[in-house]
């Protein structure tokens, strides 16, 4: 295999990377980014890989969640806090039910670029560049806004750095106190008659903490009950940006992409001779691979061989996204193929992307029951094959949006217009994400995690 370099991806087939008119300006911006400090550190990436390896052995569980696409406009401390809070709540529920640590991985601090099937979009006879995410161009349908602008990469870095700084403060500064997190969950349980069915799980945590206090253990002084490890992830789509933030670790001489702890390869960029696969081949971060209906399992095995020739546990996570109606057809074949070749992978359910539909009013949405049904089917399929579900991948927000139908509050098509704010795909709101986690945790526990 040819030697890897930071820019060897340029010799491969590249898809879904925008074209810039001013290449000289782009090169200058990338040169500046190349001198900026790393956003994450090698030791953090290694710690995450160790935790993911434990998840492959049923000794941990991954919760990966956040916005479909971050935006410059909605950037605020409150939005970051609310997303972080929901991820903490989900983690507490799953830990209580499954009795294993939860790895907290945000789709945050870098998820600014989106793949597009077409380079252009036509509205009322006017054709402009597609919206590739705020790191590339603006969502407004004007010629000026839709022109890819390299300056946006500087703002992407700046906002990612600010977000990471706040997340680290939340994670280590007392906001993650377990008793506080559980009080939020109790608030959810008591907020509606339907929520009462989850009360037992929420009460378990209270009982554990009360017992520790009763025997003289000061829970306020136990670091693990008041702080958490929190990691970041995004699709490594914008390769010029990712290359500019790739660094050599001074301690190990290994190479890391320092824009996030965890990088994933999307369903549309996952193929042999892919520039994105080539880039990820050389970095030491843990890598996710999205797996949809178009996947050829035998080709995936070849890609895994490229990315993880030593079959290192924790290096590869397979994030499958088939949809409720297709998972029974595709997932068993994939699991059989991976098991046949003895590949060590973490199985993560992404019930979001395969269940996107159009509402009666033409809005993209997802139904809560479809998300739960797909994940439930995944749990049973993996168990029948001698494997296990090791994580969930959710597009969600801490805001009270109305973008997905169903759930405790029985949101319907007619409710979607109320608070439909997404820049890309529909997200679960805080209550829906938490309700889904209650159900998934119970199902996994019932099936013997």
Segment roles from a protein language model:
Residues 61-66, 103:
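Short, hydrophobic/glycine-enriched beta-strand segments
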Residues 109, 352-353:
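Short glycine-enriched loops at secondary-structure junctions
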Residues 69-70, 74-323, 366, 374, ...:
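Active-site-facing alpha/beta catalytic cores
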Residues 1-61:
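N-terminal basic/disordered segments at the start of proteins
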Residues 47-49, 273-276, 303, 332-334:
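Glycine-rich, charged/polar anion/phosphate-binding loops
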Residues 300-303, 309, 315-347, 353-402, ...:
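Non-transmembrane, aqueous-exposed alpha-helical and coiled segments at domain scale
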Residues 52-55, 93-95, 279-280, 381-384:
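A general structural signal for short secondary-structure junctions and capping/turn motifs
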């Amino acid at each position: 295999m040819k030697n890897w370099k930071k820019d060897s991806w340029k010799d491969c087939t590249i898809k879904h990377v925008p074209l810039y008119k001013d290449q000289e300006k782009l090169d200058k911006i990338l040169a500046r980014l190349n001198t900026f400090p790393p956003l994450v550190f090698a030791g953090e990436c290694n710690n995450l890989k160790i935790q993911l390896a434990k998840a492959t052995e049923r000794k941990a569980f991954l919760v990966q969640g956040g916005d479909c696409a971050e935006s410059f406009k909605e950037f605020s401390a409150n939005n970051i806090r609310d997303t972080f809070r929901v991820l903490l709540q989900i983690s507490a529920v799953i830990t209580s039910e499954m009795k294993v640590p939860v790895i907290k991985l945000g789709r945050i601090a870098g998820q600014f670029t989106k793949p597009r099937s077409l380079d252009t979009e036509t509205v009322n006879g006017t054709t402009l560049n597609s919206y590739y995410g705020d790191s590339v161009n603006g969502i407004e349908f004007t010629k000026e806004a839709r022109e890819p602008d390299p300056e946006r990469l500087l703002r992407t870095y700046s906002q990612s750095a600010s977000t990471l700084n706040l997340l680290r403060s939340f994670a280590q500064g007392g906001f993650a106190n377990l008793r506080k997190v559980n009080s939020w969950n109790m608030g959810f349980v008591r907020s509606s008659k339907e929520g009462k069915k989850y009360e037992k799980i929420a009460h378990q945590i209270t009982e554990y903490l009360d017992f520790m206090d009763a025997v003289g253990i000061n829970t306020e002084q136990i670091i693990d009950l008041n702080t958490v490890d929190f990691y970041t992830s995004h699709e490594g789509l914008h390769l010029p940006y990712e290359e500019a933030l790739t660094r050599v670790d001074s301690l190990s001489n290994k190479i890391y992409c320092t824009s996030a702890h965890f990088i994933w390869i999307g369903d549309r960029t996952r193929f042999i001779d892919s520039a994105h696969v080539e880039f990820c081949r050389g970095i030491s971060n843990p890598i996710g691979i999205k797996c949809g209906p178009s996947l050829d399992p035998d080709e995936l095995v070849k890609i895994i061989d490229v990315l993880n020739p030593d079959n290192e546990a924790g290096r590869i996570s397979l994030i499958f996204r088939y949809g409720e109606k297709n998972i029974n057809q595709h997932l068993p074949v994939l699991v059989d193929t991976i098991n046949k070749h003895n590949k060590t992978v973490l199985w993560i359910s992404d019930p979001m992307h395969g269940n996107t539909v159009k509402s009666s009013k033409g809005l993209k949405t997802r139904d809560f029951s479809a998300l739960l049904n797909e994940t439930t089917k995944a749990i049973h399929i993996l168990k029948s094959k001698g494997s296990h579900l090791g994580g969930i991948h959710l597009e969600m927000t801490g805001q009270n949006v109305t973008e997905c139908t169903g759930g405790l509050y029985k949101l319907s098509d007619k409710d979607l217009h109320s608070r439909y704010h997404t820049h890309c795909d529909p997200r679960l709101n805080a209550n829906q994400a938490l309700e889904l986690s209650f159900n998934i945790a119970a199902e996994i526990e019932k099936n013997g995690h």
